[in-house]
């Protein structure tokens, strides 16, 4: 299989004051390196950057890349403020600090078909018999995300919930949000139980542990959830999505200042390009991503 030239993969995470979050990013990137080796990319240079609370920053990491471009992969599950504003601003700052910087920018990790497989992996880890069709048919799921002030991001979560229920035959899958939108996870659990659901479980749609993950778990268990899954973390499916995003972006890497059909409108003059639809998404029949 032909792969694009091996430019560095710079994975940019939100960052947190909770040390568990940075440790989880480290574990995920170790999984990415291992999966890359299995896919014929044994020398892949993988680096971590953070938008807030942790070091190094994205401009710092990009400034340390020598001899060529880098592919920036947001470790974010939805396209919202961080991907639409924070990352472009930091890319612009990096370009100003490093003349001639070449950057290929990938899309966010979600939506992607493999992420529902990762969610089911974590539910399985929590004791839910996700491989039993009879259990799925009698189990209602709360898909608990961080939540956003961007309605489009929350709509993405709602669409994921509907698609997951349809494709896998859960009794119901409903979205819930730990902040900025409703219903909250505890409210969603109570609503399902009041509606006759005999068994309600909560699937935590977060990459790393921290304040939101703890909040979701406490509220869900307090409302009577039978199980609450852990964060996605270094699940193999997540590592594969990171690689999919990287390969799509790296294959479209360009020289700074050049034009390209998929250059992001936020900063085409910087040579910042968005990764296109991946081979995995085409194979799974996923709808095209909107930039």
Task: Describe these PLM feature segments.
Residues 1-291:
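Active-site-proximal alpha-helix that buttresses catalytic centers in soluble enzyme cores
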